[in-house]
Amino acid sequence: MTQLNVVNDINHAGNWLIRNQELLLSYIINLISSIIILIIGFFAAKIISNLINKVLITQKIDTTIANFLAALVRYIIITFALIASLGCIGVQTTSVIAILGAAGMAIGLALQGSLSNFAAGVLLVILRPFRTGEYVNLEKISGTVLNIHVFYTTFRTLDGKIVVIPNGKIISGNIINYSREKARRNEFIIGVSYDSDIDKVIKILKNVVKNEKRVLKDRDIIVGLSELAPSSLNFIVRCWSHTDDINIVYWDLMVKFKKALDSNNINIPYPQFDINLKKKY
């Protein structure tokens, strides 16, 4: 009886296989397709992420950011490949996508501040309002850019302090870049006494600027009377120099203006006030 039962079971199994051979063949094909999609997805993710990493590094983008973006692209490709693979074997991908979406939303809410800083870091890399080594002003702080990281950027102030600022705060405020242009303009306000000869003062100030070798002669040099102040005639002087020389040129010209005015007996007045005293009888 036992041998007969075994034979019957084998016959039943064989008949079932014959009746359902198309269904089995379909399952096998779908399984193979699913495995192939996974393999292709993993290889594509690796190749594309490595390519992105190399391109970003050749563009002189911070290594940390380049690695992070490459890894992010890699995991996105693998996720899509996994969803497509599950779809091939009959899994309802809509439910999988819904679960992933809910998980992503929960993680996003938990890491809202960090994600905003990361997004700002990506924008800083793409838009490049400043680069490493440039001197910038960020409303409340000025300094040289040391490093641009994924979530924050470090600066060194003129007095040697290292300042770390989240990228979200940087991208949401005003950024003044003092180093991007090769040339910058200096502006001076020079006050002289009211009894000074206006034409003579303008000539003296122009000569001082023109004799300064570091002033760019192909840019406009402007000297003129800008204000009739309470205690002085205020002259404005504008000239251009290379960005690297901007501060030292300013300091040197201030000294030269003072010496030139002194040698021509032109006084730089102190603030004056008229006080009238009324005597009561």
From Swiss-Prot:
GO terms for cellular component: plasma membrane. It is a multi-pass membrane protein. Belongs to the MscS (TC 1.A.23) family. It is found in: Cell membrane. Keywords: Cell membrane, Membrane, Transmembrane, Transmembrane helix. NCBIfam families: PRK10334.1. It comes from Buchnera aphidicola subsp. Baizongia pistaciae (strain Bp). Gene3D superfamilies: 1.10.287.1260, 2.30.30.60, 3.30.70.100. GO terms for molecular function: mechanosensitive monoatomic ion channel activity. This is Uncharacterized MscS family protein bbp_402. Pfam families: MS_channel_1st, MS_channel_1st_1, MS_channel_2nd, MS_channel_3rd. PROSITE patterns: UPF0003 (PS01246). Its main location: membrane. SUPFAM superfamilies: Mechanosensitive channel protein MscS (YggB), C-terminal domain (SSF82689), Mechanosensitive channel protein MscS (YggB), transmembrane region (SSF82861), Sm-like ribonucleoproteins (SSF50182). The chain crosses the membrane at residues 23-45, 65-87, 94-116.
